[in-house]
């Protein structure tokens, strides 16, 4: 979507962290991941146009922390938020890429529920995106297009 919209994208720091450290994530790791992700977003937003696409942010890291450790740190919940969140439903096949978690569909659905509740608790706008291939991409395009950026 970035290519067709001209948007700047911010990748996922957590993936790099997990690839480098290969250890089970701790609370301190997740706080670091959230802070690093927010720093990447802040840096990109300085020169991005009206649309900045981010893979994740501190709010999503808070949801990860809840899933993995049973707590949602306020430090992460209080970080700046995006204008819109696309909540991707866990309706695609799971692919093991070496860092991906939760191969069990029940765990994936539980995580989606945790994310949805974190979004509600944070009071941010979000749209659920489901479907396969072009259907999923079209739904994401429509959600972003409705923002009139």
Residue ranges and their predicted role:
Residues 13, 56-59, 89-91:
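Anionic group-transfer/hydrolysis microenvironments
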Residues 2-42, 140:
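Conserved substrate/cofactor phosphate-moiety recognition/catalytic segment
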Residues 23-70:
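Conserved nucleotide-sensing/catalytic segment adjacent to the nucleotide-binding pocket
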Residues 43-47, 121, 146-149:
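Secondary-structure boundary motif
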Residues 6, 50, 123-125:
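A generic structural signal for alpha->beta connector loops
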